[in-house]
Amino acid sequence: MFLSALFVSLFTFVQFNCENLFDCQHDSLKNDVEFLPDGSYHWTPFRYWRKLNRVGQTIVSCGERNGEVETLAEQDCSISEEAVANWHLPDMVTLCEVENDSVMRDLTKRSLLRTARYEYVVTHSPDERGIDVALMYSPFSFRLINSRAVRIAPIRGMSPTRDLLYASGLIISGDTLHVIVAHLPSRRGGEQHSRPFRRVVAEKICAIADSVRAVSADAKIIVAGDFNDYTTSESVRMVCASGFTDVSAKAVGQNGARATYKYRGEWRSLDHILVSTSMMPDVRSCRVHDARFLLVEDEKYGGVQPRRNYLGPRWRDGFSDHLPLVAEFALDE
């Protein structure tokens, strides 16, 4: 009786702004000259591959929490087949600030993540810098059915921005999971000036969710990404008002991080994971992943801060200026 309820699978979901994951090749249609070997960041093949493996290390460490996993994640080595079989690596990762398909192919097929067998989908946005969003997933826990990029029509004064990424697929419970990946416009020009630009994207997110629910009223939907806004900001409140809960609203780390991003000594929650009402019973936890090797001492303001890749023009051989969010879901098999 109710035998299926006895078998529960842990589904680990990660949201990560990986900070300027560019390749070293010039795209004549994009403003990516800073991230070339002769650009202001001196973005060489060595630094590119170092960055890829840093992103891989971060993702590995977001999986099953034990000392052995974190020890491996600190090392620049590939993941063995045995490790893949015995460790619970993240099932799904949403990524912000990746340049293109080539970068995602290198990350999943040639970096230290290659034996994890992740698959991915990525957008090709009109963003002037050429940065996109991507969804990376394990084919063993998510079977992709459909994916598409959703273009945002700019309003007056708004530069072309990142596409939304919509994907759907089957999870271990047999349900269809719908995912919307977003990277909303920055606060360049000031919060008030740029607020309407983020509102436009939030409206599009709500429209996508409404179209999904028109077909399946109790659809399981996750919205994740860098909103460049807080839980109390208009864009996040708009999405929550359309039937979502910000499960990352109170997420903190275990090693001093109070949010995913730190600016002038203040921790700020710009990254969010929002879950549809129908999926809330599946939520087990949500945390900021602040493994010690992802942090450095904040010498100016005290405490710790993310170990970013660049500080101004100086390469710091770090990871990202954002920390990942990790949400865990308990799914009936």
Task: Describe the function of each predicted region.
Residues 29-32, 172-175, 180-196:
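Active-site His/acidic residue clusters
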Residues 24-28, 105-109, 132, 146-149, ...:
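Short, solvent-exposed loop/turn and secondary-structure capping segments
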Residues 19, 99, 185, 227-230, ...:
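Catalytic metal-binding/acid-base residues of hydrolase active sites
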Residues 8-113, 117-133, 202-203, 297, ...:
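N-terminal, active-site-proximal structural segment of metallo-dependent hydrolase catalytic domains
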Residues 159, 207-221, 228-333:
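Metal-dependent phosphoester-hydrolase catalytic domains
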Residues 17, 183, 225-226, 322:
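Active-site glycine-centered loops adjacent to acidic/histidine catalytic or metal-binding residues
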Residues 92-184:
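Structured beta-strand-rich core segments of catalytic domains in phosphoester-bond hydrolases
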Residues 100-102, 128-130, 187-189, 228-234, ...:
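Active-site environment of divalent metal-dependent phosphoester hydrolases
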